[in-house]
Amino acid sequence: MAKNLLRLKLLGSPSVFLNQEEVFFPFAKINALLYYLHINGAVNREEIAGILWENKDNQTAKKNLRNTIYQANKLLGGEWIVAPNRTVLSLNPECAIESDVELFTDHPAEHLSLYQGDFLQGFYLKDSEAFDYWVSKMRIRYEQLYIQACYQQLETEKDHLDLEEAERNLRRLISI
């Protein structure tokens, strides 16, 4: 049996695909948890519970987190979110997960076309300033990486007299 593939599109309007089929979750906190774990790797349970449910008491936040993990794994049909120990959460390293952010950050100049807008563009979590702040930081980070890569490509294209590509990258920069 082929291994399931979870693909996250995070640059521009975000979406989640399981084996080429888009997955829609019943509440945004599931998406937020997946996005946060994918970008940050292993995180402390209390940290993520506090970020996603900052207006709730600790016990309620932890209960909500457990339910969110259960719902995510149930809807995705497997153990995608795991707890290597009682205090840490991560995406399962044995599962196949890929994203546009990974490809883009590994080789930005080669993957400029993946930058289709701000990180998690249009994604909003009600009552979660900490999550919104994190998203803002990530947006700045990826936008700066994009701008740097565009300038690098412009230099390369200028040196090779590839005016068509240079014009395309200038248009990318102007669109920001």
Residue ranges and their predicted role:
Residues 24-25, 29-31, 57-60, 86-176:
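Intrinsically disordered, charged and Pro/Gly-enriched terminal/linker segments
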Residues 1-30, 82-88, 117:
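Short boundary/linker motifs that mark transitions into or out of structured domains
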Residues 47, 64, 103:
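Ca2+-coordinating acidic residues in Ca2+-binding motifs
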Residues 21-52, 72:
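Short amphipathic alpha-helical recognition elements used for nucleic-acid or partner binding
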Residues 66-69, 73-80:
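C-terminal flanking helix
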Residues 16, 48, 72, 88-89, ...:
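Short hydrophobic/aromatic patches on the structural cores and recognition surfaces of FHA
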Residues 44, 79-83, 121:
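Short beta-strand(s) of the beta-wing in winged-helix/HTH DNA-binding folds
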Residues 36-37, 75, 114, 176:
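Conserved catalytic core of Hanks-type protein kinase domains
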